[in-house]
Amino acid sequence: MLDSKLLRTELDETAAKLARRGFTLDVENLRLLEEKRKSLQMMTEDLQAQRNARSKSIGQAKAQGNHEEAEKILAEVANLGSDLDDAKKALSELLDELQSITMMVPNLPDDSVPAGNDEDENVEISRWGEPKAYDFEVKDHVDLGEMAGGLDFASAVKISGSRFIVMKGQFARLHRAIAQFMLDLHTEEHGYTEMYVPYLVNADSLFGTGQLPKFGEDLFHTKPATEEGVGMSLIPTAEVPVTNMVRDTITDEADLPLKMTAHTPCFRSEAGSYGRDTRGLIRMHQFDKVELVQITKPEDSMAALEELTGHAEKVLQLLELPYRKVILCTGDMGFGAAKTYDLEVWVPAQNTYREISSCSNMQDFQARRMQARFRRKGEKKPELVHTLNGSGLAVGRTMVAIMENGQQADGRIEIPVVLRKYMQGATHIG
């Protein structure tokens, strides 16, 4: 959530920055609402002051034995009280309206983010590794998995529907090995604390990280949002429960940065992805991911973004998977992000790079929603932290890349060296 002061004192400048990411802020409506807010605020304060003064006069009149005057003033106070209640109600309703508008406004892009409308205008930063040249016809991961009997899409459709998977035998083990390797790397070498978190979260948590109210249709809910009562939602990413660890807390400066990682399933309705990536493991309703989260001081967050992205890159490098790093343009960034890097892994059967990790600096956007703060040494007033998150990595897509990049002419799949200790020493599957 943006600082409301920006919408009051720097409205035109804020609108211009939002326009860079394709968001049109209704400046005239906000300006009108702000004038109403000021007027109602002044009216409320004036009525409160009048009532306080009258109440004091009642006591003075009674002390002087002038009960008739006291009764007269008491009647005036009653009328003022009614007017004050009306003014407070009108102000509260107006503040709610302003809040509902603010909740739908995305984060401001950092000045270093390139301008652009969509993914076609993202800017490539670097590449690592060279795609292999194959002397046989390349198969995709679906064919490779079904040939070996390790990926069973038909059973998943029977059990649940489309965009689900059943894995068997060595393929299920490889999936587990990938996640275990990532967790070990991030906790043992990159300094993250492993977390086990709930997979069902409440609305406050989803509001805190920005999924609600704007993206409710992308979630799986335990009860429709229209029903009374508090429902729960399946997490779309571990970013939600892990980042919410600092909601409504004040962290000591000395304890920052906080670095946390979690391996969880993620659940997404893919409401806006009809017809996209309908084959295979690329876009699923349920998929596993190892998430990286950092909580930092404001002045440290941009350096932390570089570090966090580097941690995700290290996974790909150790798995010897060719990838490229891109910075997202203003029009392609997520709702809460100020700056985002995507890592895209080479997928041979598609002859292209596909996103496997998205690493973002949210700055204080989530922290303001969550009231996540820290206190500097020697200071009384706490400040908002900055929050960062990234995939380290998406397990299913990593498996796709391993299968397709490691495929052999006979249909077997070479296991990356760093995973073999998790696979009982096996060098190939399939």
Swiss-Prot record:
A GO term, aspect molecular function: serine-tRNA ligase activity
GO biological process: selenocysteine biosynthetic process; seryl-tRNA aminoacylation
Catalytic activity as recorded in UniProt: tRNA(Ser) + L-serine + ATP = L-seryl-tRNA(Ser) + AMP + diphosphate + H(+); tRNA(Sec) + L-serine + ATP = L-seryl-tRNA(Sec) + AMP + diphosphate + H(+)
Keywords: Aminoacyl-tRNA synthetase, ATP-binding, Cytoplasm, Ligase, Nucleotide-binding, Protein biosynthesis
Associated pathway: Aminoacyl-tRNA biosynthesis; selenocysteinyl-tRNA(Sec) biosynthesis; L-seryl-tRNA(Sec) from L-serine and tRNA(Sec): step 1/1
InterPro entries xref list: aa-tRNA-synt_IIb, aa-tRNA-synth_II, aa-tRNA-synth_II/BPL/LPL, Ser-tRNA-ligase_type_1, Ser-tRNA-synth_1_N, SerRS_1_N_sf, SerRS_core, tRNA-bd_arm
Recorded superkingdom: Bacteria
Residue ranges, compositional bias (Polar residues): 47-58
Main subcellular location: cytoplasm
Region (Disordered): 46-67
Function: Catalyzes the attachment of serine to tRNA(Ser). Is also able to aminoacylate tRNA(Sec) with serine, to form the misacylated tRNA L-seryl-tRNA(Sec), which will be further converted into selenocysteinyl-tRNA(Sec).
Family from the record: Belongs to the class-II aminoacyl-tRNA synthetase family. Type-1 seryl-tRNA synthetase subfamily.
Entry note about domains: Consists of two distinct domains, a catalytic core and a N-terminal extension that is involved in tRNA binding.
Protein name in UniProt: Serine--tRNA ligase
Source species of the chain: Photobacterium profundum (strain SS9)
